[in-house]
Curated annotation (Swiss-Prot):
<keyword id="KW-0347">Helicase</keyword>
<comment type="subunit">
    <text>Heterodimer of AddA and AddB/RexB.</text>
</comment>
<keyword id="KW-0238">DNA-binding</keyword>
<protein>
    <recommendedName>
        <fullName>ATP-dependent helicase/nuclease subunit A</fullName>
        <ecNumber>3.1.-.-</ecNumber>
        <ecNumber>5.6.2.4</ecNumber>
    </recommendedName>
</protein>
<dbReference type="GO" id="GO:0033202">
    <property type="term" value="C:DNA helicase complex"/>
</dbReference>
<dbReference type="InterPro" id="IPR014016">
    <property type="entry name" value="UvrD-like_ATP-bd"/>
</dbReference>
<dbReference type="GO" id="GO:0008408">
    <property type="term" value="F:3'-5' exonuclease activity"/>
</dbReference>
<dbReference type="InterPro" id="IPR011604">
    <property type="entry name" value="PDDEXK-like_dom_sf"/>
</dbReference>
<dbReference type="InterPro" id="IPR014017">
    <property type="entry name" value="DNA_helicase_UvrD-like_C"/>
</dbReference>
<dbReference type="Pfam" id="PF13361">
    <property type="entry name" value="UvrD_C"/>
</dbReference>
<keyword id="KW-0413">Isomerase</keyword>
<dbReference type="InterPro" id="IPR000212">
    <property type="entry name" value="DNA_helicase_UvrD/REP"/>
</dbReference>
<dbReference type="InterPro" id="IPR038726">
    <property type="entry name" value="PDDEXK_AddAB-type"/>
</dbReference>
<dbReference type="InterPro" id="IPR011335">
    <property type="entry name" value="Restrct_endonuc-II-like"/>
</dbReference>
<dbReference type="GO" id="GO:0003690">
    <property type="term" value="F:double-stranded DNA binding"/>
</dbReference>
<dbReference type="InterPro" id="IPR027417">
    <property type="entry name" value="P-loop_NTPase"/>
</dbReference>
<keyword id="KW-0234">DNA repair</keyword>
Amino acid sequence: MSVQWTDEQQRAIDARGGHILVSAAAGSGKTAVLVERLTQRVINQEDPLTADRILVATFTNAAAKEMKTRVIEAIEAKIKVAPDDLYLKKQRQMMNRAQITTIHSFCLSILRENYYRIGLDPAFRIAEEAELLLLQDDVLEEVFESFYASADPAFYELIDSYTSDRDDQAMLTLISNLYRFSRSLPDPEAFYDHLIAQYDQPIDPDESSLLTRLFELEWERVGPVINRYMELSYRLRQSGYDEMADLLVQDVTPVRRINPEQDRWTTVALAFQAVEFGRWKGIRGDEEMKKFQTERTRLVSDLKKMRDLFVEKDGVDYLEDLRSQLGHVEMIVTLVRSFSAAYLEAKQQRGIVDFSDLEHFALAILEENGEPTDVARLLQERFIEVLVDEYQDTNEVQERILRLVSKSDEATGNLFMVGDVKQSIYKFRHAEPGLFLNKFKRFQQTEVGTRIDLTKNFRSRLEVLDGTNHIFRQVMDEAVGEIDYDEAAYLRLGNLGYVDSTQVDPELLLVDQTDTNKEELEAQVIATRIIEMVNDENPYLVFDAKQKRFRKCEYRDIVILVRSRGKRVQALVDVFEQYELPVYADTTGGYFQATEIQIMMSLLKTIDNPLQDIPFASVLRSPIFGLTDRDLGRIRAKSKDGSFYEAAILVAKEQTPLGLRVDEALNQLHHWRTEARGKSLASLIRSLFDQTGYFEYVGCLNGGRSRQANLNALYERAHQYEASGYRGLYRFLRLIHRLVERGEDFSEARSLGEDEDVVRIMTIHQSKGLEFPVTIVSQLGKQFNKQDQIQAIQLHKTYGIALDAIDPVKRLRSGTLLKEVIRREMDREMKAEEMRVLYVAMTRAKEKLILVGAIKGLEDQLIKWQDQPLDELLLPEMDRRNAKTYADWVVPAVLRNFLLSEDGPRWSFRIIALDEIAPYQELTKMVEQLEHVRVLEKIDHAGDETLNIQIEAAFAYQYPYQVATDTAAKQTVTELKRTEQLERAAFESTHRQSTYYRTPQFLGPTLTGAERGTVLHLAMQLYESGRSFEEQILDWEQAERISSLEAQTMREAIPELTTFLASDTGQLFEQRLLAGEVYRELPFTYKIDSARFRSDWHGPSDQAVMQGIVDCLIRDGDTYILLDYKSDQVFETTDNQNQAEVLRTRYATQLNLYQEALEAILHIRISRKLIYAFALHEVIEIY
């Protein structure tokens, strides 16, 4: 069945003559239209055009391949209908030569054919990123060394002004960043000249283009404030507060006289200097007046900040400060030019180019002195049509190249551009949406070009489209989003195949952040909503277009979109695992954070230099050597001042189990250091895998294949590093450090495939071009990233480089005029980009759109968000400009949904209470995460080791709550139990002394009673059902999970251990262990009133945080049994029954507290509390 194209789509397919811009909204079938246009051009025999005379430029190899494949398939389908058509067969063959390619590949083809024109070695290759990073570092260091050697005063003054006392890394980074930034522009040399010119402004405020621009940018903020002032004044007058209304008018009268079209800086500054704020005369008890006063206070604060810009510093001072930094900028330009030339020479010597070179070398071949070369003119003749996909993502260099190979006259040209400026989200790659916007506005006048708008969306339900339109028509316009979201931009329903449903309204879910971890709380809200959608009782129904019916929502239908990677994605993954929800985190990155990579990197760092404490200790603690935290503490205790390596050497000299193990580790490290000097890096890494057995070890862990893939990737990266001509472990480690420093990463291998029934997590950027039945947009409460705006040195393509003004005598720095301009420009551009990112995220949804945010101080924020005027469609410009999060745009727009129109777009809005968040699906997963439990109510000083308030004798009174000063805010259960026992002991006046003495250490290694108890606990923790203790102890010892001394202690205690297993409780333990219903060594944190464990507490109600570790929890039907192991002796009596009673009394408090904490945290019921006393070989029940 043939495709039924809309009128706009057909126009885009058929349009000829002149440059054509197709503005294709999300889901409008852009790719299908482009493929159809291509297909029609090559199969049309009335207007013959061979496939090799079309250039199609894309941004990814995948897009180019898909487009070429689809055109070929379309031609082959025509051939099946007309098998004897020679023209079609010829076109099919010509498709192999068609230039459907990425811009970089097209540039590469120009270089391969014309390398001799620019003196390029024909054997050049495209270098790996790692090789380029190392080369850049080497060249930069050489350039800086040469300047240090030259003793140039200007260079030394620059270094002294803008680097720290420790090193010059800040300036090295600046030169590197400035170089990369300049390469996104067609003429880097002209840009360097522009940098200098910006600091050479005339000292005349009214003639300075920078001061004029600063005023324009500030007026964008002042204008809306004045409007809010006048609107508030009007409401005051309507309410009968004429005097206060006049006061507001008086506040802004001087600035209302400013004519932003004509007035210059001096006039504007005088107007702001005349601003004075009169005294507000409130009326006691008048609540309406209080609200007006609060609004006015906020407006006064905003206007004062704006006034300060014009009053605190004179225009002449701004310009003189700028001029004072001219010498510094000239030196920076000298440095970057020196680096650029040296780096180019170094690449030529190695016969390599980078992707930036591909574009600039192609540009040099195509253009000379601003005019097209013979090569460019030949290409203009060759290509009858030049099509550009995703035009909104081009940069200025790429735009220049495309213009040079196409016909230049816009009215008669042959450039066909497709894209959507509302989806331009690659500014970090120097994409320039202004190129699209410029044509978007000009091409409305058809004589200079043709603009075709594709507004029908064939992806989404009407509810999704209406919900998206409802938000963006209120927040996006040219002032804030760089484009008006008007009728022409509205998403319109194109897919009429959806069947009506009552479940499809878009949702906004907000939760109050309180003091809970924001990422984890938000993840729990999302997990709870997904559980609701996929449950069997009342599932969300997805419409199956192929079967024309609804079906139950599956995990694979759902995507969660995040703004950025890192801990936020990990929080989602962790919570989903706790809820036992299948999840696939489709993220590039996390490789260097993977445990197995961190351990191997620590090992390589230690081999390179064992004096690095953290890597060395990490390796000792890792499974490679298997030392414990206690072992590391003993090593550090040997030498508190020296390095950890030096302390280890001292321990290795001791004839103790620890000394022997440390000695063995040091010998092994020495062997590997020797090996490193004689082997290639890749061979060394492979040898480490083999010798340590670590490769096989990680293969046995969860996700073993992925972990092994990560290790193999490290080996391959080392191999590539050496293939680039570099050698040495130190340089490899420096390369990895640079990659991490720049935020670059490798892809972490994943064991779960994309096609499986899992919830997907991906960044919004990764989702671009994709679609999903259910789209959950998270992180609405995440603050926008303003790092670029707070850097000490800032870069901007129009305004250059912003430096602080430095007073060399006073050693003071202050902001400059350029910094004020660039910071404001960057903020405008960032807000527009973030608005486009949000648009991309929301338009991924086919059937269900859910927005989620954890908001700090939600109640106060809601009061602010709902206080919006209803007389205009757009939200106030000032509020939109001041937005710090997506929620600042989305929530006010959604709230107005309930006020503007009864029949408007349907948004479901819910505030999620903490008790609505679903409990974890299985106790197992909850238990594994108990260490992450957070008390939701804030407890001051809960993290202190002790909370002792020292009362000096000088105070003349007795502090009434002295007991509180002796009580730690964080108590272990053992400490609580000990407190009770001490009080009871004091009451009974009982004094006992053990007749058992510890064997002196010089008589041989032995364990204290407490250490022996720890070993027995460890045995019960490691025990696996179905095998004897003898076998398992041998395995643990051979695997170095326990020391030989610990193994000996366990063997001696086998009778005590097996007696427990033979008991009724032990048999239940074995049964439940096989069923996976025994939970061991469970850490927890719980809040408790201090008075509960201090009988002499007479202070105010106060709380402490209790910490403990539960030895064992056994599921028994619908309840649980709490089991604790005790190895201590009872000396008060020799009668077993009496001894049991002593232990029961001794530990009743502890187990009662355990029960209370676990029942509160896990929402379970504990039916029995038991002690197994190893010394008595007896199970004792606590009542």
